[in-house]
Amino acid sequence: MTRSGYIVKWLLLGILPLLTAVGLPAYSADGDTLSQVKSRGTLRRGVSEGVAGFSAKDASGRWSGIDADFCRALAAAALGNADMVTFVPLKGSARFPALRTGIVDLLSRNTTWTLVREGTLGVQFASVLFYDGQAFMVPKQRGANAVAALDGATVCVEKGTSSEIHLADYFAARHLSVKPLVMDSASEAANAFFAGHCSAYTGDASALAAARLRAPGGAQSYTILPEQISKEPLGPVVRDDDAHWLTLVRWVFFSLIAAEEDNVTRENVGERMRDPVVERAFDAGDDVSKAIGVEPGWAVRAVQSVGNYGQIFDRNLGPGSPLNLERGLNRLWTQGGLMYAPPMR
């Protein structure tokens, strides 16, 4: 199917009702995204419908999570105000057409970077915000301790995700049988699992941990199996027709990594920038700021708004959060992880 074929198919599947539901006008996605964002005065960002630690509304109705914080950092860099973000909840099957048709300026909603997506959907991934892997959650009373124990089981999975593909491929390659129960959204898949319609629920390990927090009977009643059957590099996504916007999104993320590498935090960024060594490593200069279309000090504004990558992780996913996840591959490269910022100069 051609790229236009994908878009038409998805439009017919529900993207036009989404326009009405969120009160946003349809318009051509062509052109300078940054100029459109500045003219509009807000960054429109596609989010999940609620994944704790990534993008979910808190008790006050404010969006929180690592994805939400990244978008605030981008808004601070591009617009000078971290609060100039409009969050648009999207189902997995609606996220790419929403991006391609200009409903949102970028996606940052638990989206896996794959060749098929970049090669056929007219999108580009700016970076990896979180290294994850697909896992399985089962009721503790089931006693399963390996994925192979799920042979013949019914497994809940969200429609239109890489998890749906990996589930079928993994079991087929091992001559095991599986009965997928495909649901339209992650919340529906989780609810079906907790209601007993499935023996297991599969998805990104971090999303399973988030879903377990709201499990009936408590999180302690469910186990996430240690095996991971895929690599799931999750990151922000933009359209492939605006290299200028891609550059800005990518380097705002790298600035958050660079800040952690140089021990620049939300609290000390002003003081640390007085060190010429840190300033050179963390600020590419006024000419570069002009070239990418933002006011000087954009990286400082990003860190001042949400902190460096380590602070964002700890607050939303790590020891400062209900999820309490290990950083694992998301540690800095100097600490055995994969997070690494190219030099700014």
Question: What are these regions, as identified by a protein language model?
Answer:
Residues 2-12:
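Bacterial N-terminal signal peptides that target proteins for export
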Residues 44-53, 63-78, 112, 132-188:
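Bilobed "Venus flytrap"/periplasmic-binding protein-like clamshell domains
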Residues 10-21:
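Bacterial N-terminal signal peptides
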Residues 29-110, 292-294, 309, 332, ...:
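Extracytoplasmic small-molecule ligand-binding "clamshell" domains
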Residues 33, 70-71, 94-99, 186-192, ...:
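Short, hydrophobic alpha-helical packing/hinge segments within bilobed ligand-binding/sensory domains
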Residues 69-78, 140-144, 148, 153-154, ...:
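Extended ligand-binding regions for polar small-molecule ligands
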Residues 72, 76, 80, 84-149, ...:
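Acidic, polar ligand-binding/catalytic clefts
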Residues 285-345:
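C-terminal functional modules
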